[in-house]
A protein has these predicted regions:
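Glycine-rich ThDP/TPP pyrophosphate-binding loop and its adjacent helix/strand module
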Residues: 1-168
């Protein structure tokens, strides 16, 4: 997270139109470095996008059990930064929100926090059993698979056929 702020500062000092993007999990928003970085990025109006991949669990603890404010994007307001929640399993929605945030940063308006609501289909680590997650919850999220949803949208919009998607 702080490395992205450093990259954003470098871009601003060099006068480029680059925007630094940092991707991190929901658990990282409970670390001091998240808050320190947002504060400095806001003060310096850095061209940065901070993307929270809210997959519902920090290790094996649900967000609602570890965060008094489960809307993690709302934390950005404390630093005068726009924060937005988006369906992280909707490729088009994520693209639109990220594009707007990048455009904002390029206009010199500073950073944005984008919280992508998604789900981790496996345990946190390869060796971890994910038995702490209810089976119904896992099944519900399987229905929201972003690859399948994008494929359906492409077909519905006449942009691709099922056969073309199979080849991909």
């Amino acid at each position: 997270i702080p490395i992205a702020a450093g990259a954003a500062l470098s871009a601003r000092v060099r006068g480029t139109d680059q925007v630094a993007v940092s991707f991190f999990g929901d658990g990282a928003t409970n670390e001091g470095v998240f808050h320190e970085t947002l504060n400095m990025a806001s003060l310096w109006k850095l061209p940065a996008l901070f993307v929270i991949e809210n997959n519902q669990y920090a290790l094996s603890m649900r967000v609602v059990e570890s965060s008094a404010q489960p809307n993690l994007a709302a934390r950005a307001a404390a630093y005068a930064i726009p924060g937005e929640q988006v369906d992280g399993n909707n490729v088009v929605a994520v693209y639109r929100a990220a594009a707007a945030a990048v455009a904002r940063a390029r206009r010199g308006e500073g950073p944005t926090v984008l919280e992508c609501i998604t789900y981790r289909m496996r345990g946190h680590a390869r060796f971890e059993a994910a038995g702490y997650r209810p089976a119904e919850e896992v099944e519900r999220w399987k229905q929201l698979d972003p690859i399948l949803r994008l494929g359906e949208a492409l077909q519905a919009g006449g942009l691709a056929t099922g056969g073309e998607l199979e080849q991909i």
